[in-house]
Amino acid sequence: MIKTTTFTKRLLIGVLSTAPFFAHSAENIELPATLAMTAYGTGSAGYTQMVSIGNLLQNEYGTSVRILPGENDVSRMTPLRMGRVPLCACGIASYYGFEGVLLFADPQWGPQSIRLISTSTATFGMGVAVAGDINVKTPADLKGKRVAYIRGDDANNIGTEAFLAFGGLTWDDVERVEFPGYGRSFEGIVANQADAAFTMSVAPTAQQVAASPRGIVWPELDPANKEGWQRLQAIAPYFQPHNVTAAAGKNYGKDSPWVGATYPYPILVGNESLDDKTARNLVRVLIEDHDKYKDAAPGNTGYSLENQNMQWVIPYHDAVVEYYKEIGHWTDAMQVHQDGLVKRQNLLKTTWESFMGANPPEDRDAFRSGWMEARANALEAEGMKPVFR
């Protein structure tokens, strides 16, 4: 499952020879007069990027973009589920929605019929930031160390668990220190109450640790360590190896990258029912007009064609696939991968419908257990990995 930026760039050498050179604005763009979407809260990188893309759409094509900021996964995903907005600039919760797990293992949710439009994979990474004074070089060195666990933050804790797995560790091999929130976990590192916590490599919280007397280090994830990556991706398959050139700490930069990991942020998704014209024209603008907005907000470089992971964990919208075929950026292997994801999505939806139609338990915990068991059984019967149980 390992996918790297290097692979994508090698692939491009072959496919871009037949693809058009995008030197001018995308032509014959047809988008709605108003396009609404949800995003992370104001001040977040995702919100700032959507504002810059909205400015491009307004100035070049007369489309007004209305952004609804949401402070948590529920507030970002609910308008998409209810059909109040056609798009969400989401985080990794979009993948959990696709799978119907965690907060989506709920009677009000279930597997979501979402499709990928585009993602941003820029110079930052995602991983476990570690205090620089405890001699940690790889995830295996975290054994016996104090690792932050955030109450109510599934995405964060799964990321931490995946990094521990890379080093052959579990929560039982470390001292789990619980915190009530993400920010408090990093205050805990500075105050010497914890040694490690999960975050984005350029986040203010990571900068806070880097500026403290303890300093900061990012444990190396050697891409040649196939077994380590298999363990990590068995827990969190959305991670991919990445040479991170933007990371907190004086020892990291363009010439001395953190050999680590990342996953896209934000993740621009729509429902499967999003009309083809909107999906197609939006991805055309994002790809063909990239030079016009790539410097307008931090992270916008990540929307370039070469930064798209064409074999990720959420299926592309059908109209996006057709666009990539037309420009020569689609292979047989990509189609096989896409077909597999669509098959998984359809199986999850039919399994959910059967489960909901069989008088499921009213108790939330019993409901979740029953659904997760039915889900795992259905996936395994088709030779697919449940990932979550």
Q: What feature does the model see in each segment?
A:
Residues F21-S25:
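Sec/Tat signal peptide C-region and signal peptidase I cleavage site
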Residues R10-P20:
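Bacterial N-terminal signal peptides
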Residues G144-A162, Y238-Y303, Q308-V313:
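Ligand-binding clefts/hinges and TM-proximal coupling segments of bilobed small-molecule sensing domains
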Residues E27-G152, N156-F166, V177, W218:
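Short, glycine-/small- and polar/acidic-enriched structural segments
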Residues P32, S201-R214, W218, K277-A279, ...:
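An extracytoplasmic/periplasmic, membrane-proximal ligand-sensing/linker region
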Residues I2-L12:
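Bacterial N-terminal signal peptides that target proteins for export
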Residues N55-G62, R81-V85, A165-L169, V190-A194, ...:
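Sec-exported extracytoplasmic/periplasmic mature domains
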Residues I92-S94, V101-Q108, I134, W171-D173, ...:
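Pocket-lining segment of extracytoplasmic ligand-binding domains
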